[in-house]
Amino acid sequence: MERFLLKANYTPKGDQPKAIKELTEGIEKGLKMQTLLGVTGSGKTFTMANVIANVNKPTLVIAPNKTLAAQLCAEFREFFPENAVEYFVSYYDYYQPEAYLPATDTYIEKDSAINDEIDKLRHSATAALFERRDVIIVASVSCIYGLGDPQEYRELLLSVRKGQIYEREAILRKLVDIQYERNEYDLTRGKFRVRGDVIEVFPASYTDRAVRIELFGDEVDRILEFDTLTGEIIGELKHVAIFPASHFATSKEKLERAIKSIEEELEERLRYFEERGKLLEAQRLKQRTLYDIEMLREVGYTKGIENYSRHLTGRKPGEPPYTLIDYFPKDFLMIIDESHITIPQIRGMYEGDRSRKEALVEYGFRLPSAFDNRPLKFHEFEARINQVVFVSATPGPYELKHSQKIVEQIIRPTGLVDPEVEVRPTRGQVDDLYGEIKERVARNERVLVTTLTKKMAEDLTEYFREMGVKVRYLHSDIDTLERVEILRDLRLGVFDVLVGINLLREGLDLPEVSLVAILDADKEGYLRSERSLIQTIGRAARNVNGKVIMYADTVTASMQKAIDETNRRRKLQMEYNRKHGITPQTVQKAVRDVIEATRAVTAELPEVKRDFIQKMSAKEFKQYVEKLTREMKEAAKALEFEKAAMLRDLIIELRAQKAVKK
């Protein structure tokens, strides 16, 4: 049986050993729900990795958004280089759901752009679950949305062995049945081509490799794996399993049954409209559905096939859909990261989906069975949990109520303590903050400032810019990739101060940040609740000089609770440090691009050890940077722009480290 092999250059420290032991024991005793209450920067991901390695179960990790899922996936891949760590998020770069607005008689057709890279990763994830047990899938909440029947997906796979008797025509028919497209010129993912007795297939779950099946008569003579770009042979295989190119692929018999079932529902629905005199709706539904049926008959696929998923999988009306969770074996482990955000998200998915579809069904754009192409309801999601660990610095009411064990991880491995929190009056707050910023910039540290309104954030950014501060404003219109670049530039010192409204969003745990300023801290609301304030305070917890200033004229109940909880943790941490003679150190974290988490192959970069850099003489350091600069220019000349950009960032980071050391 495959085991998880955890690779790390460090061992559990602080509260990690206790948390790992308690959570592992809880899982082995069969506890269904546990919570890891881990403060920011306490190494919760490393604790999770150790628990996964100990219990050795296939694991689903659910994160609240794509960016956080990408970060977690990158970290788990570093911890488990020999195991299958997969990424499963919504494959839409852009998604406009199908909708109808009766007030203006406006039909909005579904419009989307599918990210081929993410679609490949989704196929890779489901294929891994059928091929091995040492699998970790990091997913967003999209994992509770409908997917094809896992049993059908497994049964439809094309299995080819060397020496097997398999007619050429039978292989080709099978490939078409499982939604592979024949294309003699363009061999890309989900396509195949034929040259005499040689069949070349690019499996849906592969990145840059394809499979060549060589036949001798009806016997499989050789199976080769080759590079799709260069044609170079990578190796010879004894067996290959090619999974369907679509999660909604279905067998001929089931497709016929599904079409019959769709036709019956259509007849019934047309009667319903005609009896009520809704002839326009009846005509619309008939035209659209008959077209879809024709497409299903001819090519086994149609745009919006997911709306017929109930018929294709043979489910009864109202029955929950199959989801990624159904692809896992029964004894799997679930970890819900940032559970205080993720659980409410899961809870709200069904209602949002239902309300949008009601108009589509009522006005004849879709059959009522479209309601069954939906995310899981919360009670259905609960029923699919085998064992779960909720992970959060501020667990929500659901986790606190249902967990059979709550494990605290307060002590950080670095010895860092929670930041000191100070409340200052709002009068003269901007000038006071400017003085604090100047201090931090002089020490090569960074500052986060959170405001309550867009106008305040914009005005503050403009004012600081006029005062000569290198400042950026992080607003909600910025897309995910641009956010990642802004955060990277903040870490590299391209600018020093980041102003934003919601600093609770992902990726803002930056070790260079030594000051978090909270303006209007006494205005009660979502962003100034106890839980939000504790999360915001945690943004300064990765730096040894971490400090939080709340600007407020009164101390609200939320502020007091957040300050009290921070002081409780701070006291425990300081006592532990005193007892064990630990001197806190700022977290040392490489500026790694989280965008790379979703790429299977990244540019090869030299692994740089900080202590190695600091021991270099000025001359050695200069020569090393010159070498990297040459490599960067060569990469740019060879059109390897990603590698060149990564080398550029590495050079900036190294120079910054050397400057700090001086």
From Swiss-Prot:
Keywords (A to Z) from UniProt: ATP-binding, Cytoplasm, DNA damage, DNA excision, DNA repair, Excision nuclease, Nucleotide-binding, SOS response
Biological process annotations from GO: nucleotide-excision repair; SOS response
Predominant cellular place of this UniProt entry's protein: cytoplasm
Domain (Helicase ATP-binding) ranges: 25-412
InterPro entries in alphabetical order: Helicase/UvrB_N (IPR006935), Helicase_ATP-bd (IPR014001), Helicase_C-like (IPR001650), P-loop_NTPase (IPR027417), UVR_dom (IPR001943), UVR_dom_sf (IPR036876), UvrB (IPR004807), UvrB_inter (IPR041471)
Amino-acid positions noted as binding ATP in the UniProt annotation, renumbered to this chain: G38, V39, T40, G41, S42, G43, K44, T45
Keyword Cytoplasm: yes
Segments forming domain Helicase C-terminal: 429-595
GO MF entries: ATP binding; ATP hydrolysis activity; DNA binding; excinuclease ABC activity
Protein location: Cytoplasm
Disulphide bond pairs: none
Motif Beta-hairpin, chain ranges: 91-114
Pfam annotation, one family: UvrB
Residue ranges constituting the UVR domain according to the UniProt record: 622-657
One cellular-component annotation, GO: cytoplasm
Highest taxon listed in the record's lineage: Bacteria
Record note on domains: The beta-hairpin motif is involved in DNA binding.
Protein family according to the UniProt entry: Belongs to the UvrB family.
Task performed by this protein: The UvrABC repair system catalyzes the recognition and processing of DNA lesions. A damage recognition complex composed of 2 UvrA and 2 UvrB subunits scans DNA for abnormalities. Upon binding of the UvrA(2)B(2) complex to a putative damaged site, the DNA wraps around one UvrB monomer. DNA wrap is dependent on ATP binding by UvrB and probably causes local melting of the DNA helix, facilitating insertion of UvrB beta-hairpin between the DNA strands. Then UvrB probes one DNA strand for the presence of a lesion.
Subunit and interaction comment: Forms a heterotetramer with UvrA during the search for lesions. Interacts with UvrC in an incision complex.
PANTHER family hit by this protein: UVRABC SYSTEM PROTEIN B
NCBIfam families the UniProt entry points to: PRK05298.1 (NF003673), uvrb (TIGR00631)
Name this protein carries in UniProt: UvrABC system protein B
Species name: Carboxydothermus hydrogenoformans (strain ATCC BAA-161 / DSM 6008 / Z-2901)
